[in-house]
Amino acid sequence: HPQFLAKLFFQEVPEIFEGVIEVKSVARDPGSRAKISVHTEDSTIDPVGACVGMRGSRVQAVVNELQGEKIDIVTWSDNQATFLANALAPAEVSKIFLYEEKNKVEVVIPDEQLSLAIGRKGQNVKLASNLTNLEIDILTEEEESERRQIEFKEKSSLLTEVLDVEDVIAQLLVTEGYVSVDSIASETLENIEKIEGFDNDLA
């Protein structure tokens, strides 16, 4: 049970026992690996360092109690993106796209970090998901770049077709953030003329 892990830290870390450090969430794959997020309002205290202890003594006592279960201790944050990046450690995160209404996030990571982010049998991403209470989709930088190119082509070909303009003009418009006919129709002539490569006649 996740609360069992929190209780062990409560026993081993005086700052948790005293209420100076708070255990915010726990995610476990019992017997294998766990993640725990901690937070303190006291800026002079490093909550992760306090839980690890001198030379790892505190966390090691908890690990021994759990027969060698690996434990990641991460800093909790009320900023979802920061907390998520911490939760996915040891993998590095390049970008995070939040879809707040769905409790879902898309995380972009360097290509070579993919196996680290997902973990053995999906363990790292699963624990990070449970810890943050978010559904996590992981993309590599290459996959994200390919997707953006496809989206760019789709948007520019739509404008080419609807506005009956050349490809290069449609691409210019999409690059400037005009991704729909409505967004162009509602824009002033003056602003469209400002786009590099556009003149009064073209606009």
Question: Model segments located where?
Answer:
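RNA-contacting regions in translation and RNA-metabolism proteins
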Residues: 1-203
